Amino acid sequence: MNNLIVFGSPLIADRVPRKKFDELILFEKKEKYAERLRQLLPNAKVRNEDVNSPGFKAMAKARLEAGSVHFLAFVDPEGLEIEWETLQHLFDFTGDLIINYQSTGVSRSALKENKTSAEIETLQRFFGTDEWKACGNEDALFKLYLEKIRKHREVTIPIKVRSPYRFHYYMIVAVRKTRGSQRWVSVIEETKEKIEAIKPEDLENIIRRLSGGQVKLAV
């Protein structure tokens, strides 16, 4: 399965939607990855910059402050990279977010004994509070994070994704509540049920099938 190519979030955002986004703005702090994104998505605006930087906040304010621009932000950090202050900045504008919360990694860092001062500071920035210190397990940490998001977006739907490699993460869909029916929120709820019903071994079989290693899925 080493040669299997799987689309990441930027490519999915560009290739999958029937109705294309008006604009794609991508932040990637690693230069080699930013350059690769430019090659794969020549029409996207790729910025080789840390999303927690003042540059991101200035860009977001300039582009979104008027309130006439609706956006979907897909927040796909590595570990504890995304700071709560950055999310808070996005919540202040008119838009929806999908946030990848890496539950296993977060709990491993937060529940670790004898943390360094740098590790504690990273956790403080990630949660935006010291309340994480009172959390004794993985579920409590996730609940804290989820409740902080719900203070800014009434419609917040966590989707648990279980990996075949013995870890899991959550895709948190956080959207504004509007006066309309928001039929697509029901679609997200239905999708949540389907994704959470998938067993880790099913995912492994899917990967093998895509890579040509298995003829059919186990039932």
Residue ranges and their predicted role:
Residues 1-59:
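SAM cofactor-binding core of SAM-dependent methyltransferases
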Residues 22-23, 70, 96:
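Residues at the starts of beta-strands that form the adenosine-phosphate
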Residues 55-67, 88:
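Short amphipathic alpha-helix with an adjacent loop that forms part of the alpha/beta core around
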Residues 69-81:
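A short SAM/SAH-binding and catalytic strip from SAM-dependent methyltransferases
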Residues 79-92:
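A short, conserved alpha-helix within the catalytic core of class I
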Residues 94-108:
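Conserved beta-strand signature within the Rossmann-like core of class I S-adenosyl-L-methionine
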Residues 109-175:
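A conserved mid-domain beta-alpha-beta active-site/ligand-binding segment of alpha/beta enzyme cores
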Residues 178-210:
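Flexible, glycine-/basic-rich loop-and-beta segments that form/coincide
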